[in-house]
Regions:
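Flavin-dependent oxidoreductase catalytic cores
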Residues: 1-366
Length: 366
């Protein structure tokens, strides 16, 4: 019997060969000036076995960076580097979306233009948050985030414009679409959270106001590159990057999901952080989101094949994203379908470095 997980799926403008998604994962392997390397083209092409690849997060501007060696999408050289990636993926019969990203307050002055402060919804610093930047001795490593400054209305407009240009650049580089990163304690997630976002203007207060920034960006990006080419990632109840518990979480994400449904986005990608020891998405919230969002839903977080089969067969998910298993298993769909054992990921090689732990994982030999 063929499980739905391995069946083709029509994702708006794309026909996917299966319902398996390669989740976006930061690997910190860009070259000088945050330009994608030829090793990255090899890495993604190896994993074109997925129905859809979602790239690692691409900062939309120099201000959007929070980690060393994360490939950007705001210079001609970066666009040229990503063209090599998309060409390799398409040559391998794959489909690929670019995740476009602003880290918000999760950054350090050593990564910011002219040593300026990171930017977020307010000037409150996340207690205990860190990022991969330069320490006081100029050495790369995990450092505490710098004190942010609050985005004013001009800054919000500037960031919105950066996302639009990044989406255009991604399409110029050959991407099949973009995913707007609204999860994991980064900029848009910070605006969504009622404890973090204490603004008193049109971008703070009610769920409608706290969702406004993300929805404006979705609208602007959709206008720029077209309906059906824009996905959104969220992480309800997430705690990454020192995000606090939000008493208005459910109301916020149900409102957001309903508004995204009205916009006919390509998909809604929901990340559950429980697999990393964080609180899980509350039981019952995903079905509530499913009731108000009728488009394709990607679920991500600690999946194996049986659970993926179950959630797709029950209609909870349309597609399932795999993260760490895809790092170590470029042939993941075949391994899942045939019950073959999985390679173990080299966690010491997750961030930075060269080909080791990146493009040297073998495919299974029956």
């Amino acid at each position: 019997m063929t499980h739905k997980l391995f069946e083709p799926f029509d994702l708006k403008t794309l026909s996917l060969k299966n319902r398996i998604v390669m989740a976006p994962m930061t690997r910190c392997r860009a070259g000088a000036d945050y330009v994608p390397t030829i090793f990255m083209a090899e890495y993604y092409a190896q994993r074109a076995t997925a129905g859809l690849i979602i790239t690692e997060g691409m900062p939309v501007s120099p201000k959007a960076r929070g980690y060393l060696w994360t490939p950007g999408i705001y210079t001609p050289q970066q666009i040229a580097g990503w063209k090599k990636v998309t060409r390799a993926v398409h040559d391998a019969s794959g489909a690929i979306f670019a995740q476009i990203w602003h880290v918000g307050r999760v950054s350090h002055q050593s990564l910011q233009p002219d040593g300026s402060a990171p930017e977020g919804p307010t000037d409150e610093q996340p207690e205990g948050a860190s990022c991969f930047a330069y320490d006081e001795n100029g050495a790369p490593g995990n450092v505490s985030t710098s004190h942010p400054r609050a985005l004013d209305l001009d800054g919000i407009s500037r960031v919105r414009g950066a996302f639009v240009q990044a989406a255009r650049n991604a399409c110029k580089a050959g991407m099949d679409g973009v995913e707007i990163h609204g999860a994991n304690g980064y900029l848009f997630d910070e605006f969504l959270n009622s404890v973090v976002n204490t603004r008193s203007d049109a971008y703070g207060g009610s769920p409608e106001n706290r969702c406004r920034f993300l929805l404006e960006v979705v609208d602007a990006v959709t206008d720029a590159i077209g309906i059906g080419r824009v996905g959104v990632r969220i992480s309800p109840n997430g705690r990454f990057n020192a995000m606090p518990e939000d008493p208005e979480m459910e109301a916020t994400f149900l409102y957001l999901s309903e508004e995204l449904n009205r916009r006919n986005i390509a998909y809604l990608h929901i990340n559950d952080q429980a697999t990393f020891g964080m609180p899980a998405i509350p039981e019952g919230l995903i079905p509530k989101i499913r009731a108000v969002f009728q488009g394709p839903i990607i679920l991500c977080g600690g999946y194996d094949a049986p659970r993926a089969h179950g959630d797709i067969n029950e209609g909870i998910a349309d597609l399932v994203a795999f993260g760490v298993p895809y790092i170590a298993n470029p042939d993941l769909p075949a391994r899942l379908e045939n019950g073959w054992p999985l390679n173990n990921a080299d966690r010491d090689a997750f961030y930075g470095g060269g080909k080791k732990g990146y493009t040297d994982y073998p495919v299974y030999q029956p």
